[in-house]
């Protein structure tokens, strides 16, 4: 089943969190001159038009990137993220396009770096391929993203980031994430892994945490932003990133900017944030 289309949700509060974390990890990895490998398992199309029927139908971006777009008090890290989105809008004042994870990464990768973007959705993949055809160091494939950890790791660079952000349409995605991490870590224990997760039902989210704890892998950091308290009602109340082998700067960077993000993205006052170790060093 491949019904999920990210265009309905592009630029929402979950994307803001995910893409700031992604940016900070890649910035920190790029402090070393040596090239790195970036794998994006569920790439989507890479770029989204916010005037599309899908985006306009939900309007989710208005409560995400839309709440940061014209702010003049952005913390330094958040300002760098907004600048990446402004580049995609040709520096204009109007917010017309939003970057998916692949486009965020493409703006940060250097000539010595390499990326693989995978997407299985038959409507999304041709758009993804077209959006990245000019990037010589980026490869796109219409393949199962979970399987790429086993197929492509370890990378020749021996440095890199794997982003796993499935739609969680199917309940087994929660288990497939853990299995993919096990396969990847077995081959590439020094790599950084970032897993995006939604909080729709808290017990589903805990399956990922418990599954990762059971692997015996160390250095697992959880970063979460909630827009309202957990609920049995339908809808996503929070989202987060689990980062394995995070750059040492990441924990403090997120602790410093999450109070601002929570206050700005959730002005109603129902938001909260968490940065904590699921498994320490």
For the regions a language model picked out, list residue spans one by one.
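Class I S-adenosyl-L-methionine-dependent methyltransferase catalytic core
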Residues: 1-281
């Amino acid at each position: 089943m491949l019904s999920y289309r990210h265009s309905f949700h592009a630029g929402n509060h979950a994307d803001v969190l995910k893409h700031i974390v992604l940016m900070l990890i890649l910035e920190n990895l790029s402090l070393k001159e040596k090239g790195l490998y970036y794998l994006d398992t569920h790439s989507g199309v890479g770029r989204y038009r916010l005037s599309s029927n899908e985006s306009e139908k939900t309007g989710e971006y208005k409560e995400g990137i839309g709440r940061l777009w014209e702010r003049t008090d952005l913390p330094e890290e958040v300002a760098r993220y907004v600048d990446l989105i402004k580049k995609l809008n040709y520096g204009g004042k109007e917010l017309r396009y939003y970057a998916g994870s692949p486009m965020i990464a493409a703006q940060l990768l250097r000539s010595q770096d390499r990326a693989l973007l995978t997407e299985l959705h038959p409507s999304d993949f041709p758009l993804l391929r077209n959006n990245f055809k000019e990037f010589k160091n980026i490869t796109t494939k219409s393949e199962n993203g979970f399987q790429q950890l086993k197929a492509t790791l370890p990378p020749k660079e021996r440095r890199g980031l794997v982003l796993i952000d499935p739609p969680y349409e199917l309940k087994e995605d929660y288990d497939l994430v853990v299995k993919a991490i096990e396969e990847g870590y077995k081959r590439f224990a020094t790599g950084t892994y970032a897993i995006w997760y939604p909080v729709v039902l808290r017990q589903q989210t805990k399956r990922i945490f418990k599954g990762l704890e059971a692997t015996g892998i160390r250095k697992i950091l959880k970063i979460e932003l909630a827009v309202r308290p957990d609920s049995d009602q339908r809808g996503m109340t929070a989202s987060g990133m689990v980062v394995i082998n995070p750059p040492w700067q990441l924990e403090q960077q997120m602790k410093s900017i999450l109070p601002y993000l929570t206050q700005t993205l959730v002005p109603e006052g129902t938001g909260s944030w968490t940065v904590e170790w699921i498994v320490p060093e």
